[in-house]
């Protein structure tokens, strides 16, 4: 079901502004019926940080090829692949500055799939999202029949949105249940314990003081020992724990956060680049330029020019 009339949005503008210091992405759902389908494309050099969310996500690779980062794993994905992301897993879609990538992303809260049936049955439907172990195969590749079926059902859901009538909501739930069944059947041999979800939440709670420190003090020098102290851990334990939980070192996460702030500020032509570098915690404009280019793929000046055109 290829369709040239989808409303494609830039991945960066659609994703990055909704990510806070903890890397939590807030999605603009219709709260009365929290499910949405978006059509996204890569638009030049951009940095999208590792992020996590409480909702569930299914990505269809519409065109191009890239890597999906899930924590510290880089998973190749190409046109026709599916990507399945559960709650509270740090992840992002990576792409080269000049690569043409289009994705179709369906995000939904689990209550959409719950309709009064026995709790055990509902959990089976959602189990591919709720029990993703560290080696879980998030990318479904070389299964074109499955990918085609899921993509076509996602498009059907999109056509029913916004689902403001009973008939439309019944249609969306029916199509979603069909998708969930297809994924459950595919992942039957990979489903682990549901206790994994609670374990992940506990790990993230232990890191909350570090994220709070980052949000409040990113304009100032922050050392690993400062974040470790905030979390009541030794520096060595904190570094290992942070990397295991988030997928990046604390220093890399802090740098990405600062550069993400800089990207936003560069869209305002009134603020000098030298001032922006200081506002996001860099003492040297030249070093800021080096780091920005390494992470974003272009210089701050060129990024500003492209953003304002």
Where are these regions (language model features)?
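A hydrophobic/aromatic-rich effector-binding and dimerization subdomain
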Residues: 2-39, 90-159, 189-190
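Basic/polar phosphate-binding segments, predominantly the helix-turn-helix DNA-binding elements
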Residues: 181-189, 203, 209-260, 271, ...
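Short, conserved beta-strand element in jelly-roll/cupin
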Residues: 51-68, 84
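Short acidic-glycine-tyrosine-enriched beta hairpin
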Residues: 72-86
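Regular secondary-structure segments
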Residues: 62, 151-162, 211, 215-218, ...
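Conserved short histidine dyad/triad with adjacent acidic residue
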Residues: 36-53
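An amphipathic alpha-helical interaction segment
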Residues: 141-196, 209
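Short, structured helix-loop boundary elements
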Residues: 123, 147, 151, 169, ...
């Amino acid at each position: 079901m290829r369709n040239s009339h989808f409303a494609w949005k830039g991945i960066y503008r659609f994703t990055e502004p909704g990510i806070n210091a903890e890397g939590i992405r807030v999605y603009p759902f219709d709260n009365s019926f929290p499910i949405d389908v978006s059509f996204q494309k890569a638009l030049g050099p951009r940095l999208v940080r590792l992020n996590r969310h409480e909702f569930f996500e299914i990505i269809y690779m519409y065109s191009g090829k890239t890597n999906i980062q899930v924590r510290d794993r880089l998973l190749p994905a190409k046109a026709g692949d599916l990507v399945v992301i559960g709650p509270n897993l740090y992840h992002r879609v990576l792409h080269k500055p000049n690569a043409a990538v289009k994705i179709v992303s369906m995000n939904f809260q689990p209550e959409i799939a719950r309709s009064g049936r026995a709790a055990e049955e509902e959990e089976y439907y959602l189990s591919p999202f709720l029990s993703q172990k560290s080696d879980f195969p998030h990318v479904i590749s070389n299964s074109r029949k499955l990918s085609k079926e899921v993509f076509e059902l996602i498009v059907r859901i999109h056509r029913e949105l916004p689902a403001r009538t009973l008939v439309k909501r019944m249609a969306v739930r029916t199509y979603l249940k069909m998708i969930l069944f297809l994924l459950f059947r595919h992942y039957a041999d990979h489903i682990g314990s549901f206790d994994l979800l609670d374990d992940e939440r506990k790990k993230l709670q232990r890191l909350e003081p570090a994220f709070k420190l980052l949000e409040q003090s990113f304009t100032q020098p922050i050392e690993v020992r400062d974040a470790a102290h905030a979390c009541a851990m030794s520096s060595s334990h904190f570094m290992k724990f942070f990397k295991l939980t988030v997928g990046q070192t604390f220093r890399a996460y802090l740098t990405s956060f600062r550069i993400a702030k800089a990207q936003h500020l560069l869209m305002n032509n009134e603020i000098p680049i030298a001032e922006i570098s200081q506002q996001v915690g860099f003492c040297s404009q030249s070093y800021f330029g080096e780091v920005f280019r390494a992470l974003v793929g272009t210089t701050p000046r060129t990024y500003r020019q492209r953003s304002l055109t």
